[in-house]
Amino acid sequence: MQPLQSAGYDRAITVFSPDGRLFQVEYAREAVKRGTTSLGVKSKEGIVLVVDKRPTSKLVEPKSIEKIFQIDEHIGAATSGLVADARAIIEKARLEAQINRITYNEPIRVESLAKKICDMKQMYTQHGGVRPFGTALIIGGVNGRGCRLFETDPSGALIEYKATAIGAGRPAAMEEFEKKYSDDMNLNQAIELALDAVYEATEGKTTPESVEIAVIEAADKKYRRLPDDEIRDHVEELLIRKEKEEEE
């Protein structure tokens, strides 16, 4: 990408630069790139969401850091970027999910919710007096059309993925996904792959306390956050596996 040389075109959100760029949107993307790494993986048995939530200080309570959110009983989201912006979008998403249940007496489809979130993000790139949301979301869930995984960025763009990552560790994580992803993975293999990607994205600084994992299984279409003991087991398996790889 070209250097962000604004020449004054970043003073208003609604003004394009001569080469067709909205600098405030690009600045919002930079906020996401500086955020902690979040990942999503789709398998034949469900969706896996994993985030790196290493505290910035030893005085921070790890449990107070929240980067994965339940939106509805069958949908979850992982975020990167400005936490307060992400929280505002999550609250809006939860409201849309409940409105759909009340109006149509059925759970909202994953793609419909993702599009509604992107519509809101796009509106904040088009009006004066507001700024773009400095956060990206990975939205995963299971509905009648199977397992779905979407990524939204600050511009309101929406892309569906088999596996994706956002945040500072995205390049390393995506490289790991490109090498190891398979359509035939079960849920445990998807968790293994996601943790491999987090390990690469954090340069090996992965511990049981530094990651958070949530799954939405295709069998029951229910969001579930993994308890600490399950996360510890998965991370210990990861570290043993990496030790063996280094020895070889």
Swiss-Prot record:
Localization in the cell: Cytoplasm
Pfam families recorded: Proteasome, Proteasome_A_N
Broad class of the protein's primary localization: cytoplasm
Activity regulation, short description: The formation of the proteasomal ATPase PAN-20S proteasome complex, via the docking of the C-termini of PAN into the intersubunit pockets in the alpha-rings, triggers opening of the gate for substrate entry. Interconversion between the open-gate and close-gate conformations leads to a dynamic regulation of the 20S proteasome proteolysis activity.
Keyword hit for Nucleus: no
Assigned keywords, A-Z: Cytoplasm, Proteasome
GO function term, MF aspect, one: threonine-type endopeptidase activity
Example of a GO biological process term: ubiquitin-dependent protein catabolic process
SMART domains: Proteasome_A_N
Membership in a protein family: Belongs to the peptidase T1A family.
Protein name according to UniProt: Proteasome subunit alpha
Organism: Methanothermobacter thermautotrophicus (strain ATCC 29096 / DSM 1053 / JCM 10044 / NBRC 100330 / Delta H)
